[in-house]
C-alpha cells in the first residue's frame, strides 16, 4: 500500500494491490466515495437474544425460537449509522419472531419495538445519532 500524505494528514493518493484497511475511523470529506470491485460488510451470526454492538452492520439470525436484538443507545452512534437484520433460516412465523428493541425511551419509526415474523424477512434501520431509529 502506498499512501501520500497531504495537508492536515489527508490522504491525497492511494494505490494498493491488497486493499486499504482503516483500523479506526476512515473518513472521506469529498463529494463521493467510488468503490471499484466489491464492498464487504461485517456480518455477525445471531442464534439467541443479543445486543447489537456499535460496530455491527449485518446481523444474520438463525433461530428456532423468538430472538430479541437490543439496539445500542442511538446517542452512542454516528447519525446515519445503519444496521441490517435478516432471518437467514426462514424460520419466522406468528410464534417465532425477531424483536428489535431500541434503548429505553428510544423508538424505531415511532414504535418501541419492531417485530419481524415473515420467513426470510429483513429490515434496514438507521439512526439519527440522538434518540431515534428509522426504517429504510
Model-assigned labels for residue ranges:
Residues 1-2, 29-36, 105, 115, ...:
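Short, low-complexity N-terminal tether/leader segments at secretion or assembly junctions of large
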Residues 2-6, 20:
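Disulfide-braced loops of extracellular cysteine-rich modules
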Residues 11-14:
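Small-residue hinge/turn detector
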Residues 19-22, 108:
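Short loop/beta submotifs within extracellular cysteine-rich repeat domains
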Residues 34-101, 127-136:
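Exposed extracellular interaction/assembly regions and N-terminal maturation sites
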Residues 58, 111-116:
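Beta-strand-rich interaction surfaces with strong enrichment in secreted/lumenal proteins
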Residues 101-109:
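Short edge-strand/loop segments of extracellular domains
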Amino acid at each position: 500500500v502506498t499512501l501520500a500524505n497531504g495537508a492536515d494528514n489527508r490522504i491525497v493518493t492511494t494505490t494498493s494491490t491488497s486493499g486499504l484497511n482503516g483500523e479506526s475511523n476512515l473518513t472521506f470529506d469529498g463529494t463521493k466515495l467510488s468503490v471499484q470491485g466489491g464492498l464487504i460488510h461485517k456480518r455477525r451470526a445471531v442464534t439467541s437474544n443479543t445486543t447489537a454492538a456499535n460496530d455491527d452492520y449485518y446481523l444474520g439470525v438463525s433461530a428456532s425460537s423468538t430472538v430479541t436484538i437490543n439496539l445500542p443507545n442511538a446517542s452512542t452512534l454516528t447519525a446515519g449509522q445503519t444496521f441490517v437484520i435478516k432471518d437467514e433460516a426462514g424460520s419466522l412465523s406468528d410464534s417465532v419472531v425477531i424483536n428489535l428493541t431500541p434503548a429505553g425511551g428510544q423508538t424505531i419509526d415511532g414504535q418501541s419495538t419492531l417485530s419481524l415474523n415473515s420467513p426470510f424477512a429483513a429490515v434496514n434501520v438507521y439512526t439519527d445519532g440522538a434518540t431515534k431509529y428509522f426504517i429504510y
